[in-house]
Structure formats: C-alpha cells, structure tokens
Amino acid sequence: GKLGWGDTQAMVNVTEDIAKRKGIGDKLAEGNARAAAYFGHPELAMAVKGQSIPAYDPRGMKGMGIAYATSNRGACHLRAYTPAAELGVMPFGSLKVDPLEWKGKGALTKVFQDVHAVSDSLDLCKFSAFAQGMQEYTDQFNAVTGMNYSVEELLRCGERIYNLERHYNNLAGFREGSDYLPKRFTHEPS
C-alpha cells in the first residue's frame, strides 16, 4: 500500500514488510542512508558513515554533533557522550561548556572518545559515567587486574583504541571527508 502521513496501519504494515524484506520493505531494511540513496535523495538521510543519527539533535549540543561526525562507527551517542559535560552532569561538571557554542568542543569530544573507549573495554555501562569518572574506572581496572595504571595511562589506552579503530576504518576505505554531519544539521536552523 501507500504510505501516508499519520496512517498508523500503513506504519504497522511497512514495519512488517521491512522485517520480511517484502516490497518497499526490502529497500527500507537496508537503513535510511541506503534507502535514501536508492530513491535518489541521499541528502535526506540523517546518517554519518551510513549509521542513522540517534538520540540527540546535534544542533542543540554542538559537542554531540562533533562526536557523531567523528565516531568511528558512524553517528553514535555512545562513543563520546558529551552531554555529560554539555548539560553539566557530574562527575564531568568541571568540563561544563555551553551546549550551543562550538568553542572547546573538539577537545571535549576527544576526552570523551578516550574515556568511552576505556569504559567499552571495561564493559561498563556508559550511564555509570553519571556517577563515576576516570579515577573510579582506573581504580576498578587496577583492582580487577592487579595492575597499577594511572588515570593518564588508562586514558592513553583509550586514545590508542580509538586510533586503532580509525586506522581500521582507513583500511576499509573511509577517508578525509567521512567525518561530517548531514547538511541539514549544519545549514538548516533547528
């Protein structure tokens, strides 16, 4: 059938078609970036590196926009959770910055990329960062492994992980120009 705005039954039907890869659902099952390209309008895809923009509109939190654009796995709010600082959530309150300003967001995003590469490696929930910081992560790591890493050493491990992922992406064909937000986020008002 035809999709129309507000047609809830059509939404249910197309969801089933996507699951069964039937009709138009076969194209939509590929994700919004591929579907938009297939239908001749790649500019309509709200995606980075083929992954759809999740969770937060980057026009309201500039650091999140940089994080989406530079995430090694495409738009992902879990690779550098800058809202912890942009919204002043502890323990990163000392990093609090204006969410609507660009100033300092590159450095902020890099800190969170490194922190979250560490927390991913420790298999910790990202939301534990609302109550814990790198000192707590380091203490936990040292307690479990019997090692004696400093916060700086563990952050360096996070940086290496992130850079290794970046290198893998380069080998897979990502190049300069892959780290971008869709133009609708950079050229249209929110």
Model-derived features with residue positions:
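Extended C-terminal regions of large enzymes
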Residues: 2-190
